Amino acid sequence: MAVPKRKTSPSKRGMRRSADGLKSATYVEDKNSGELRRPHHIDLKTGMYRGRQVLTPKESA
């Protein structure tokens, strides 16, 4: 079994853990509707993705 040769310092441990934090979600403004949506995701209200109709749009009640 592998064993560390040297003790990891608190600084090195903290630098390694700095990438573990959660990042906030990224949103882009839709060109057609102006609403915010996730990049590279289908707009569920219109059913459009990259200018193509992928899903049938939901009817608003």
UniProtKB/Swiss-Prot annotation:
Residue span of region Disordered: 1-35
Record keywords, A-Z: Ribonucleoprotein, Ribosomal protein
Family matches, as Pfam families: Ribosomal_L32p (PF01783)
GO cellular component, one term: large ribosomal subunit
Any one biological process term the GO annotation gives: translation
KW Ribosomal protein (keyword) present: yes
Stretches with biased composition (Basic residues): 1-16
InterPro entries: Ribosomal_bL32, Ribosomal_bL32_bact, Ribosomal_zn-bd
Highest taxon above the source species: Bacteria
Any one GO molecular-function label of the UniProt entry: structural constituent of ribosome
Similarity comment: family membership: Belongs to the bacterial ribosomal protein bL32 family.
Name of the protein: Large ribosomal subunit protein bL32
Source organism: Agrobacterium fabrum (strain C58 / ATCC 33970)
Source organism phylogeny: Bacteria, Pseudomonadati, Pseudomonadota, Alphaproteobacteria, Hyphomicrobiales
The gene coding this protein: rpmF
